[in-house]
Amino acid sequence: MSKIRVLSVDDSALMRQIMTEIINSHSDMEMVATAPDPLVARDLIKKFNPDVLTLDVEMPRMDGLDFLEKLMRLRPMPVVMVSSLTGKGSEVTLRALELGAIDFVTKPQLGIREGMLAYSEMIAEKVRTAAKASLAAHKPLSVPTTLKAGPLLSSEKLIAIGASTGGTEAIRHVLQPLPLSSPALLITQHMPPGFTRSFADRLNKLCQIGVKEAEDGERVLPGHAYIAPGDRHMELARSGANYQIKIHDGPAVNRHRPSVDVLFHSVAKQAGRNAVGVILTGMGNDGAAGMLAMRQAGAWTLAQNEASCVVFGMPREAINMGGVCEVVDLSQVSQQMLAKISAGQAIRI
């Protein structure tokens, strides 16, 4: 099998050296070239035709976002962004994902060499995922048409959503058309700390419903979406007649925290047939067992189809496990989940 050919663009000579060490330490990939800025990278891309580009967000001569926008228009290819953990860094990274980057890694704030080498396996995994990702599914999405407001639903009704690679844009596409009459939504997207708040704030500006990073103990309200905070699990709990959110530092599940399975299992237990479960694009199997538990508890469950997924890993695993009632294109997810929750459709298996 041929190796994954990687080109790294970073203005830091140290970062270029570290990325080269990391990539070349894995037998299934090789660093074919490095560039100090996008202008040099442009020529190297033509020369080496890499499978994956790693791209620093902030660089002289042309910043990473400008370059990414031009690249995706003229020569689309899988890109993994390398970002700082600053507030500005998280906003720029989310913009990069919107423009077509597949994923991102964050630079440690201290001890760059030790920190990056500790991330070696994670970086390699993201490069492998990017090499296999569907670029056709990751072209910038148009703004979906707002759905008509439906009848006000019981506050017992809610929707649980799980996603990973490619999920930030898929979630935007699902939430943006939702009317204020929508039920509450609980969302777990695999993301490091420092990014989930920026992600929620960005969605809150774009959506009619309220979107926020979830907080421990807060009451779950219709017309609101709650995003699991980075590196914390989110569960649905009860407080008397109301739903509330539980945030905790339990061990990683399926190598993830937050984990989609943790959310889905709690929703199966607390909401049962009053819930709809949705699994979107992502690598791995997180959410498959939890979605089966939701279906067995009477919830209606949807999976995003392969054609519209950046990575058809998590939906495929959920389908194979038998936890999915219906497979739909991303463009139909919002409409279908609202139709099912409004109809109170549920099926026991």
Swiss-Prot record:
PTM per Swiss-Prot/TrEMBL: Phosphorylated by CheA. Phosphorylation of the N-terminal regulatory domain activates the methylesterase activity.
Name recorded for this polypeptide: Protein-glutamate methylesterase/protein-glutamine glutaminase
Compartment(s) where it occurs, according to its Swiss-Prot or TrEMBL record: Cytoplasm
SUPFAM superfamilies associated with the record: CheY-like, Methylesterase CheB, C-terminal domain
GO biological process, any: chemotaxis
Organism for this UniProt entry: Escherichia coli O6:K15:H31 (strain 536 / UPEC)
Modified residues (4-aspartylphosphate): D56
Residue ranges of every copy of the Response regulatory domain listed in the record: 5-122
